[in-house]
């Protein structure tokens, strides 16, 4: 039985990152809504509890609160941002709107006399004060400590940036230790779960494999399952997991929608059908998708159409499998976050995802999402634990709608053909130069505009493509990859010379935020 941390979600976009950091520490955790019952908390029997951030103000009517049992159970509690504020308010302190809001980097003085922050600092001032570089995102602040608490961290804008009641092992921080911008954040969370909560490092991927297999078997029983197999990391890992769990009860449906990477269909069929022995049905639906997408330029509309047609194809294939009761998908945490929190519905929608936003009520299959609680790096670990090839598991992410969201505006077969050839050249050169492993995601975007060029003695008027490569630890934030000019030049020359119809190549130097990784 795992030692467990309970994370209560108050609606922050960062909440799932808390879970990721705790798991990285080798500690099992679960994320649940903030309004769970007292009986649930007691039955969960956590070693410690973390209260997440959130968009509300604790002094307003009807704002969320932590269940009272959180503070009477006798286990350590860490409140983050709003979690600290509701802790303060519920235990007798005061919270007010801040005259000066803090969003972004901040420097705070860490008072090292508490167990949580002792000897954790980024630097020491001439006066001997330990300082931390942290990430703030708040418009309210604690103005009076509850009884039994002492000051743990502060700066000019936020005099109470951290608080601690060491007798009860209650801690609150106004900053976000779960994001990478807080340089010592991982150290702080490790200190909480290991030293303060007393958890060991007993959660690991091999154990998770057995738990996931058991859960799938329990849920599915003797029913048959169909899975949309694209060849991407997520669907490949789902296929391997389900094949291990239910064997021939799994049928994979590979849908060629005309928006896949170069030679994708051949590679998928060879890897899974021939090498792994998985049952795979190959459906060529290119004409169908192109017909439905004709004339549509709005990105959200394209995503919805592609998602809808996938569902229709699966329904048609399911009718040929009378025992099929389940539709499996490779939905992972970042998909859910960007579509809005699936657990609480409190995070703001950024963009819809075809895995979580396009399933109609008339779908006759139940949804099975075994990767729903995992981040991308955890999915890759799971794939390795399941015995999948390294190159397959560490392939860059590919969006569910495929090239449909990498062709800006209207989707045409001509555009898709040009894009997949240009993209193949980019990826080939990244691999040859050793940069593929140094980037987290790289791809080419087709711009439906033409520019003037010169080739030989003639004038050209052809299309433009943009190269995009980013580096990230969690896909929540990302930096553009500083690829060598010589590499970019070689890719550009090859694309322009080898892909007739493209005469200009540009490179995207936008980070996330403010841009998203994909263009649409």
Curated annotation (Swiss-Prot):
Residues 203-395 form the GMPS ATP-PPase domain. Coiled coil: none annotated. Keywords: ATP-binding, Glutamine amidotransferase, GMP biosynthesis, Ligase, Nucleotide-binding, Purine biosynthesis. Homodimer. One of its GO terms (cellular component) is cytosol. It catalyses: XMP + L-glutamine + ATP + H2O = GMP + L-glutamate + AMP + diphosphate + 2 H(+). Its EC number is 6.3.5.2. Pathway: Purine metabolism; GMP biosynthesis; GMP from XMP (L-Gln route): step 1/1. This is GMP synthase [glutamine-hydrolyzing]. Residues 4-202 form the Glutamine amidotransferase type-1 domain. Catalyzes the synthesis of GMP from XMP. NCBIfam families: guaA_Cterm, guaA_Nterm, PRK00074.1. The active site is at 81 (nucleophile), 176, 178. GO terms for molecular function: ATP binding; GMP synthase activity. ATP binds at residues 230-236.
């Amino acid at each position: 039985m795992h030692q467990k941390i309970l994370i209560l979600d108050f609606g922050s976009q960062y909440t799932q990152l808390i879970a990721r950091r705790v798991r990285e520490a080798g500690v099992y955790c679960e994320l649940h809504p903030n309004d769970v019952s007292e009986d649930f908390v007691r039955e969960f029997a956590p070693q410690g509890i973390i209260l997440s951030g959130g968009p509300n103000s604790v002094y307003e009517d009807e704002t969320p609160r932590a269940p009272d049992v959180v503070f009477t159970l006798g286990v350590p509690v860490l409140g983050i941002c709003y979690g600290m504020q509701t802790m303060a308010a519920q235990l007798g302190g005061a919270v007010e709107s801040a005259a000066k809001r803090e969003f972004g980097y901040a420097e705070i003085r860490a008072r090292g006399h508490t167990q949580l922050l002792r000897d954790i600092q980024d630097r020491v001032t001439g006066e001997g004060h330990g300082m931390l570089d942290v990430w703030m995102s708040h418009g309210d602040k604690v103005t009076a400590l509850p009884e039994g608490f002492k000051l743990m961290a502060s700066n000019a804008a936020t005099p109470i940036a951290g608080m601690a009641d060491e007798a009860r092992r209650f801690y609150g921080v106004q900053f976000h230790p779960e994001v990478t911008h807080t340089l010592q954040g991982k150290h702080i969370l490790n200190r909480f779960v290991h030293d303060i909560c007393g958890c060991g490092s007993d959660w690991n991927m091999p154990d998770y494999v057995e738990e996931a297999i058991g859960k799938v078997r329990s849920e599915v029983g003797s029913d048959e399952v169909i899975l949309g197999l694209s060849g991407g990391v997520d669907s490949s890992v789902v296929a391997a997991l389900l094949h291990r769990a239910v064997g021939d009860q799994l049928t994979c449906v590979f849908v060629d929608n005309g928006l896949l990477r170069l030679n994708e269909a051949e590679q998928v069929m060879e890897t899974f059908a021939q090498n792994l022995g998985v049952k795979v049905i190959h459906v060529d639906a290119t004409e169908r998708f192109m017909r439905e997408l004709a004339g549509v330029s709005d990105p959200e509309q394209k995503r919805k159409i592609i998602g809808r047609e996938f569902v229709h194809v699966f329904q048609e294939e399911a009718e040929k499998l009378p025992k099929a009761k389940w539709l499996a998908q490779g939905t992972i945490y970042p998909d859910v976050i960007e579509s809005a929190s699936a657990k609480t519905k409190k995070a703001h929608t950024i963009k819809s995802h075809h895995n979580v936003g396009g399933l109609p009520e008339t779908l006759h299959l139940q949804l099975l999402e075994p990767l729903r609680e995992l981040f991308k790096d955890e999915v890759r670990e799971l794939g390795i634990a399941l015995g999948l090839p390294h190159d397959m598991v560490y392939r860059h992410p590919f969006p569910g709608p495929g090239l449909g969201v990498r062709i800006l505006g209207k989707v045409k077969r001509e555009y898709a053909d040009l894009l997949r050839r240009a993209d193949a050249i980019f990826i080939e050169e990244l691999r040859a130069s050793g940069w593929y492993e140094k980037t987290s995601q790289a791809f080419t975007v087709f711009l439906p505009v033409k520019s003037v060029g010169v080739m030989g003695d003639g004038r050209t008027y052809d299309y433009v493509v943009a190269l995009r490569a980013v580096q990230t630890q969690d896909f929540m934030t990302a930096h553009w990859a500083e690829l060598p000019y010589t590499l970019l030049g070689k890719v550009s020359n090859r694309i322009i010379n080898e892909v007739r119809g493209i005469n200009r190549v540009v490179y995207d130097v936008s980070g996330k935020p403010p841009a998203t990784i994909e263009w649409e």
